[in-house]
């Protein structure tokens, strides 16, 4: 698989959160595309920038009231669909 840019990883994680809100399930699904460290770092970055919020101990949610979900680029669509 081609290397993904930082922004591609953030967008992919946001779309994965839209599909799987449970953090443990989310990380397992993202492991097919990203390392666990990259997935966790991306989640932490998205929480820190308030694009994602934590609802309880295990649930993540896109913070669409704060920022819109970015458009999914065509080259990421097959990856996001296969998660």
Which residues are covered by each model-predicted region?
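Minor-groove-contacting beta-hairpin "wing" of winged helix-turn-helix DNA-binding domains
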Residues: 58-67
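Short amphipathic alpha-helical interface segments
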Residues: 2-32, 83
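A short, conserved structural fragment
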Residues: 47-58
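Short, amphipathic alpha-helical interaction segments positioned at domain boundaries
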Residues: 66-83
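Short amphipathic alpha-helical interaction segments
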Residues: 33-48
């Amino acid at each position: 698989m081609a290397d993904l840019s930082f922004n591609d990883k953030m967008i992919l994680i946001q779309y994965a959160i839209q599909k799987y809100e449970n953090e443990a399930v989310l990380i397992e699904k993202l492991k097919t595309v990203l390392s666990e460290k990259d997935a966790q770092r991306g989640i932490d970055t998205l929480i820190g920038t308030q694009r994602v919020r934590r609802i309880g101990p295990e649930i993540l949610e896109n913070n669409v009231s704060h920022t819109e979900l970015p458009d999914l680029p065509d080259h990421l669509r097959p990856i996001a669909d296969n998660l």
